[in-house]
């Protein structure tokens, strides 16, 4: 291919990658996620089991999918991701409301397909896009591409949150129907599947963008057995490369510490808003507002990445996370939203830095596998922290011994659990530096 054709292909892939990410993330059921599962007829225990199944699926398929992307082809993995997203939404549309065992089976299949889609897309989309830019000699533009993708993804998430919450509210829908002169009315049961249908439309766009991606043909076509054998060899080679290479080793360790503690708070955010006396109606607006930080945080991250070292940026992000975690422990009514802003900004900084540094450091043939190791490690550390947090809650309850009862007890236990997070975070930070020193001594750069 000529230089102009390579450049044209690169920017074509950038556009497709951007839309793929935006619509893969824009899931209209997110603002009513738990409520929707329960309205279908699932119990809280079933909801917890399904979330566990989803996390286990991602961890199980994460690294093999990255290695398959590096051997079978990144575009093929993206097509698999788009296909799984289509099927996971179709399963929920077909699932019977209040369908007992059959309902749980449908949701289990949905969580399995969703986990496979997440694992297949993780790393393959970035690796394909970065390699096409590198082939055109434009890899220096990757920072700006990431900035735009994060900005557009945040906008897409904002609108998905707003629209998803609105279409699930029968009062809102009935008001719109009256405004347009319609005499019909709807209730909650009529709207349960509407966010799912809208997300199915997003899945169509995701699948279309995967088909539009262009990848250089493989040097050789392998059979299934040879492909799987090479996949596992590639996984082993990449694991050894990460273990013996300073920068990716440290970046993945840092990502595990930063990502897990922030995500732990994000899963508890609605309870935190309740504790600081924010009205329930504001929760969707808060989530959308936090997502809008993606309009400027990636730009700040790009400037920091260009002007400062990875270690300096890690320390800056860690300081912001620590300040946010300490602030959460005070649970100040209304004003308690401020420390949460530090954490929402930090998760975006972390995502940008990790993606940029790993893409720049990883060899082209191993890039998707390296990025999959990132996903595996962060999901693993998040799962471990979730188990530890559950144990902490049980321990705090045993210490309370009925001193406080009812909702006040629940809130007291929750606030006390938040006060442990900054100290856990400091211990993990110390372990990062100790691990780095034991593995590489006083080395500061690769």
Indicate residue ranges for each PLM-predicted region.
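C-terminal ends and interior cores of transmembrane alpha-helices
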Residues: 83-101, 107, 319-333
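Alpha-helical transmembrane segments of multi-pass secondary-active solute transporters
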Residues: 47, 77, 145, 194-198, ...
């Amino acid at each position: 291919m000529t230089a102009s054709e390579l450049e044209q292909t690169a920017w074509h892939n950038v556009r497709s990658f951007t839309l793929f990410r935006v619509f893969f993330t824009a899931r209209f059921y997110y603002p009513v996620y738990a409520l929707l599962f329960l309205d279908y007829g699932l119990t809280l225990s079933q909801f917890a089991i399904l979330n566990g199944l989803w996390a286990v699926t991602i961890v199980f398929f994460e690294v093999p999918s990255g290695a398959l992307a590096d051997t079978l082809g990144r575009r093929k993995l993206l097509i698999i991701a788009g296909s799984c997203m289509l099927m996971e939404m179709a399963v929920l549309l077909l699932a019977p409301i209040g369908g007992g065992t059959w309902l749980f089976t449908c949701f289990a299949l949905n969580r399995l397909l969703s986990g496979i889609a997440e694992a297949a897309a993780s790393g393959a989309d970035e690796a394909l896009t970065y390699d096409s830019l590198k082939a055109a000699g434009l890899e220096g533009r990757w920072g700006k591409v990431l900035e735009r993708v994060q900005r557009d993804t945040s906008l897409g998430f904002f609108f998905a949150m707003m629209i998803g919450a609105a279409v699930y509210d029968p009062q809102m829908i009935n008001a719109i129907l009256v405004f347009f002169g319609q005499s019909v009315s709807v209730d909650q049961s009529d709207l349960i599947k509407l966010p799912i249908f809208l997300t199915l439309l997003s899945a169509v766009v995701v699948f279309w963008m995967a088909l539009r991606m262009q990848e250089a043909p493989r040097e050789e076509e392998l059979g299934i057995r040879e492909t799987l054998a090479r996949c596992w060899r590639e996984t082993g080679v990449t694991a050894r490369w990460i273990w013996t290479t300073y920068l990716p080793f440290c970046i993945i360790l840092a990502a595990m510490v930063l990502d897990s503690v922030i995500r732990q708070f994000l899963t508890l955010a609605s309870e935190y808003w309740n504790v600081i006396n924010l009205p329930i109606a504001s929760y969707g607006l808060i989530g959308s507002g936090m997502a809008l930080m993606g309009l400027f945080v990636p730009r700040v991250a790009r400037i920091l990445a260009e002007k400062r070292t990875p270690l300096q940026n890690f320390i800056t992000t860690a300081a912001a996370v620590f300040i946010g975690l300490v602030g959460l422990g005070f649970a100040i009514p209304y004003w308690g939203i401020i420390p949460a802003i530090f954490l929402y900004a930090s998760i975006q900084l972390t995502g940008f830095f990790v993606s940029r540094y790993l893409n720049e450091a990883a060899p082209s043939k191993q890039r998707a596998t390296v990025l999959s190791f990132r996903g595996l490690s962060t999901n693993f550390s998040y799962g471990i922290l979730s188990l530890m947090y559950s144990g902490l809650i049980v321990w705090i309850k045993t210490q309370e011994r009925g001193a406080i009862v009812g909702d006040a007890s629940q809130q007291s236990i929750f606030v006390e659990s938040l006060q442990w997070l900054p100290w856990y975070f400091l211990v993990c930070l110390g372990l990062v530096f100790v691990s780095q020193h034991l593995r590489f001594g006083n080395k500061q750069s690769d």
